[in-house]
């Protein structure tokens, strides 16, 4: 089990999304629970990103949205960084 936190940017996005699309927020919460309940070997199944995002991993939420997160295996800590449309995440 991992400890976790959300970035300030992600907290804002989830708060806004809660007003517009509660179902997507429920899906995000389900993915967060899935990730933090993983063990160290299972967390490696999530895709590592490349280039300037290489310190992040990602998981798809719904069909076109991505939740990015950073894992510190030594501290057993996950920082959820961003949630956005697939095209906007990768255009950075």
Report each predicted region and the residues it spans:
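Enriched for short, Lys/Arg-rich terminal
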Residues: 1-3, 12-25, 61-92
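Short alpha-helical linear motifs
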Residues: 30, 50-54, 69-73
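Residues that form or immediately flank small-molecule/cofactor binding pockets and catalytic motifs
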Residues: 9, 54, 85
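A short, surface-exposed loop/turn module that caps and links secondary-structure elements
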Residues: 34-59
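N-terminal first-folded block
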Residues: 9-41
């Amino acid at each position: 089990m991992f400890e976790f936190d959300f970035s300030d940017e992600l907290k804002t996005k989830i708060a806004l999304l809660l007003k517009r699309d509660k179902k997507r927020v429920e899906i995000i919460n389900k993915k967060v629970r899935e990730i933090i309940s993983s063990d160290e070997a299972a967390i490696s199944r999530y895709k590592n990103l490349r280039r300037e995002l290489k310190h992040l991993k990602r998981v798809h939420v719904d069909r076109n949205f991505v939740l990015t997160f950073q894992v510190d295996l030594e501290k057993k800590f996950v920082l959820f960084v961003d949630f956005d449309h697939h095209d906007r995440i990768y255009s950075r």
